[in-house]
Amino acid sequence: EDLPRGWGDEQAPGSYRLRRRDDGALFGFAAGAQSAKPVFFPTDQLLWRGRRTRGGRGLEVDPATGPGADADRGGPPYAVLGVRSCDLGAVGIHDTVLTGRGVGDVHYAQARQEAFIVAVACSDPGGTCFCGSMGTGPAPEAGKGARFDLSLTEVLEGGHGFVVDVGTQRG
């Protein structure tokens, strides 16, 4: 009910148009401009809390939020529905940068570890899409880009249905 059944889009440089589809597709639109990154790496996040010491010349960091404290995003884990393979490729790069090389962002790592990702294959890529040239699509592949728990390919011929690929044990 909350998914855009029967809607598609037309994307071209400098142009974006919604269009009605006759097939009732739930995912019949191309990847939008907003990626999955803000789900895992928000623009506003509490990292630590502190207060001035008596006399106002120093800073006392709350041990529950300071360096070495366990990451706490302050909310439940996310389930992300409709992540496209190009976004999985980008999240895979974020994973390397933000969790690799021995130094990482514990908050990002926790969000990624807890998230349940349902990827969706692009059946109608936009005119501005470049997943084919980057080797990231149009369908998600296990081991390429970021991990996904489930991947859906929408099938409209012979009735509306989905082919489901399992990417992880949780899926």
Where are these regions (language model features)?
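Iron-sulfur-associated redox domains of electron-transfer enzymes in respiratory
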Residues: 1-171
